[in-house]
Design a protein with these regions (language model features):
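Short catalytic/signature loops enriched in Gly
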Residues: 3-4, 21, 142-148, 236-275
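Conserved ABC transporter NBD signature motif
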Residues: 64-75
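Conserved ABC ATPase "signature" region
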Residues: 74-75, 127-146, 255-256
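A short, proline-enriched helix->beta-strand linker immediately N-terminal to the Walker B motif
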Residues: 170-174
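Helical segment within the ABC ATPase nucleotide-binding domain
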Residues: 191-205, 216
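A short, surface-exposed alpha-helical micro-motif characterized by mixed small hydrophobic
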Residues: 218-220
């Protein structure tokens, strides 16, 4: 049995474009252990999201991936659509940045939640609905049964993201991939959602890949961190060691761009340069 939930080795991702081949990810390697939160941090265009999309067969038609990806010991890079579909939304779940676009606007919350349970866990409708209510309560949504009958636009942004977390966790996944899960939320709601995700990770022993540009979120949530720039990993290691003794200039710039109350200037001029 594999000691890691996810093992990525020398993964390369490229895209065919009218101007030639663009290399988005250039041979990255890392792993995620059961119950661990791995932070993957870098500016926009660093390749962090493309790494996970490639690993799970979600690249667009012009994308290509090479290397090795093992999920629970099984090689899944290039696996058949049937195998990948059985994993996605079941053993591997996603939480995206904007829940309003991730949810289907013309379908009630219960329809969208129950579909996952009926398809992947083969539940009947009464059992699926009961599990939906249970998970909405677990993510601290009041009046859960009533909320199930509502449409996405009738919920606040924070409540919609809680629905997405419930949908992601209710199939008992081994891996949760959270791609900028709180960027679209205000600071107070962001803190509540991060606390919720941390509580669920501890309660369920689910591995979490937390993709973000925010080193403050990494410090709050992750045990280990991978720093990406221009499609490459420039540094990785335990969060405490990396924050206290960063080895790479880019990591230091990311850390220095985080506002500190004690700073006389917020350090925006030290933010990492955009490519």
């Amino acid at each position: 049995m594999s000691a890691s939930v996810l093992d990525i080795t020398d993964l390369k991702v490229s895209f065919d474009t009218p101007d030639g081949v663009v290399e988005a990810v250039k041979g990255v390697s890392f792993s995620i252990a059961p119950g661990e939160c791995l932070g993957v941090v870098g500016e926009s265009g660093s390749g962090k999201s493309q790494t996970f999309l490639a690993a799970l067969g979600l690249l667009p038609h012009n994308g290509r991936a090479a290397g090795a990806v093992r999920f629970l010991g099984q090689d899944i890079l290039g696996a058949s659509p049937r195998i990948l579909n059985s994993l996605r939304g079941h053993k591997v779940s996603f939480v995206f940045q904007d829940p309003l676009t991730a949810l289907t606007p013309h379908l009630r919350i219960e329809t969208q939640m129950m579909e996952t349970l009926i398809q992947h866990l083969k539940m009947d409708k009464p059992a699926a609905r009961a599990r939906c209510v249970e998970w909405l309560e677990r993510v601290r949504i009041p009046e859960a049964a009533r909320r199930l009958r509502q449409y996405p636009h009738e919920l606040s942004g924070g409540m919609r993201q809680r629905v997405m977390i419930a949908m992601a966790m209710m199939t008992d996944p081994s891996l949760l991939i959270a791609d900028e899960p709180t960027t679209a939320l205000d600071a107070t709601v962001q803190a509540q959602v991060l606390d919720l995700m941390e509580d669920l990770r501890r309660d369920t022993n689910t591995a979490v890949a937390l993709i973000t540009h925010d080193m403050g979120v990494i410090a709050r949530m992750a045990q280990r961190v991978v720093v990406m720039r221009r499609g490459e990993i420039v540094e990785q290691g335990p969060v405490g060691a990396l924050f206290h003794e960063p080895k790479h200039d880019y990591t230091r710039m990311l850390l220095e761009s985080v506002p500190r109350i004690s700073s006389s200037r917020l350090g925006a001029e030290r933010a990492p340069p955009q490519d």
